[in-house]
């Protein structure tokens, strides 16, 4: 059985400022750095062999903190990037016009053909995220990889493993530095292939999430 751990990056400056990041970038906040240290301690005893990360700065920094604790090298994987949000990237979510908000909702709610201008569809995201996960099956036998990616991207991956449409990720809350695990296995009691063992675990974190503070 192959066990693959999934970590969302730590809180970034644009997370805190409510700016749309997508494949644009901003550094981790002090809280984000702290979250990364906490999840690193959480997985320290899990015998992680590979840390594979999106090549964006916020995920790379999170991966660096985890790698230092786990003693692993970092592998960059562009297919783990966040959903490309096109012309809305870098914008504050509260500044969107009604038309722009319709674009954003269409891409996230599964509207056929939903796509922000110059951006990516949820189905395209699902294809590349699954390809990145499947590549883990080429690692040496006994490997226990950890993937560092993004909220929408990881939600899409976990949801599609469960047989849900790509846009169902909006029903799954994966907070900054939450920990999930998916396994590739063959069991007489479960579906063969990828299954979800756990999703969105935050028991290792010690501060409220942004969405809790902003209620």
UniProtKB/Swiss-Prot annotation:
Query: Which reaction is this enzyme known to catalyze?
Result: (2R)-2-phosphoglycerate = (2R)-3-phosphoglycerate
Tell me the InterPro entries matching this sequence.
Answer: His_Pase_superF_clade-1 (IPR013078), His_PPase_superfam (IPR029033), PG/BPGM_mutase_AS (IPR001345), PGM_Phosphatase (IPR050275), Phosphoglycerate_mutase_GpmB (IPR023086)
Q: What positions are marked as the site Transition state stabilizer?
A: 150
Concerning CDD domains, the annotation shows: HP_PGM_like (cd07067)
UniProt binding sites for substrate: 8-15, 21-22, 58, 60, 82-85, 151-152
Enzyme Commission number(s) from the entry: 5.4.2.-
- Mind listing the GO biological process terms from this record? glycolytic process
Associated pathway: Carbohydrate degradation; glycolysis; pyruvate from D-glyceraldehyde 3-phosphate: step 3/5
The reply to whether Lyase figures as a keyword in the UniProt entry is no
Task: Give the active-site positions.
Answer: 9 (tele-phosphohistidine intermediate), 82 (proton donor/acceptor)
Is-annotated flag, keyword Isomerase?
Answer: yes
Mind telling me which SUPFAM superfamilies this protein's record contains? Phosphoglycerate mutase-like
Alphabetically sorted, this entry's keywords are: Glycolysis, Isomerase
GO cellular-component term (any):
cytoplasm
Q: What is a single Pfam family found in this protein's UniProt entry?
A: His_Phos_1
According to its UniProt record, which protein family does this protein belong to? Belongs to the phosphoglycerate mutase family. GpmB subfamily.
NCBIfam families, from UniProt? Answer: PRK03482.1
HAMAP family referenced in this protein's UniProt entry, alphabetically = PGAM_GpmB
Protein name stated in the entry: Probable phosphoglycerate mutase GpmB
Native source organism of the sequence = Photorhabdus laumondii subsp. laumondii (strain DSM 15139 / CIP 105565 / TT01) (Photorhabdus luminescens subsp. laumondii)
């Amino acid at each position: 059985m192959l066990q693959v751990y999934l970590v969302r990056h730590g809180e970034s400056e644009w997370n805190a400022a409510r700016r749309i990041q997508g494949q644009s970038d901003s550094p981790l906040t002090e809280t984000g750095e702290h979250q990364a240290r906490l999840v690193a301690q959480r997985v320290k005893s899990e015998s992680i062999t590979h840390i594979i990360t999106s090549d964006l700065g916020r995920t790379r920094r999170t991966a660096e903190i985890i790698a230092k604790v786990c003693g692993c090298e970092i592998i960059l994987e562009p297919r783990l990037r966040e959903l490309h949000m096109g012309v809305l990237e870098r914008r504050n979510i509260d500044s969107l016009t009604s038309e722009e908000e319709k674009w954003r909702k269409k891409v996230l709610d599964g509207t056929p053909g939903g796509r922000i201008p110059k951006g990516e569809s949820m189905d395209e995201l699902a294809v590349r995220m699954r390809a990145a996960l499947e590549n883990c099956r080429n690692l040496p036998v006994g490997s226990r990889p950890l993937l560092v990616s993004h909220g929408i991207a990881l939600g899409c991956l976990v949801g599609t493993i469960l047989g849900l449409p790509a846009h169902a990720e909006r029903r799954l809350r994966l907070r900054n530095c939450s920990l999930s695990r998916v396994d590739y296995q063959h069991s007489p009691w479960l579906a063969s292939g990828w299954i979800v063992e756990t999703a969105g675990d935050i028991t290792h974190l010690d501060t409220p999430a942004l969405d809790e503070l902003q209620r």
